[in-house]
Design a protein with these regions (language model features):
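Catalytic cores of TIM-barrel enzymes
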Residues: 1-122
Length: 122
């Protein structure tokens, strides 16, 4: 019988051998996944099509929801604050279309413009 994600994580951080390698995608800004890749992974696993939330807009990291966590066998779940790294509340999500055509969600009070290169400016 394999150990739970929690047990394997506990073994890992205590420098003991877990049942298997602990998998972390998307729980931090370091292990995050770009919004375009989150959408492609959702499609690959046949999950519901919906806009990905840009939980970290500087790197354009997407929210890894519980259905994708289950499909990929991810062990670590992120705990995000009420605001993103720019201090913008993570609420009242609004639809945004990226320069590559992907529809994503940004926090409602995340205000931006585009420059002549198509870059997002805050």
């Amino acid at each position: 019988m394999t150990a739970s994600s929690r047990n394997n994580f506990t073994e890992t951080i205590n420098h003991r051998q877990p049942d298997r390698v602990v998998v972390d995608f998307g729980s931090t800004g370091v292990t995050g996944i770009h919004i375009a890749i989150v959408e492609k992974l959702r499609n690959y696993y046949g999950l519901e099509k919906r806009p990905v939330k840009a939980v970290e807009p500087y790197q354009m990291l997407g929210e890894v929801e519980s259905d994708l966590i289950d499909a990929m066998g991810i062990d670590v779940v992120g705990l995000f604050g009420a605001k993103n790294m720019f201090g913008v509340p993570a609420e009242d999500w609004k639809l945004h279309k990226t320069i590559w055509g992907q529809e994503v969600l940004f926090p409602g009070s995340f205000n931006y413009t585009y420059n002549s290169n198509g870059d997002i400016l805050m």
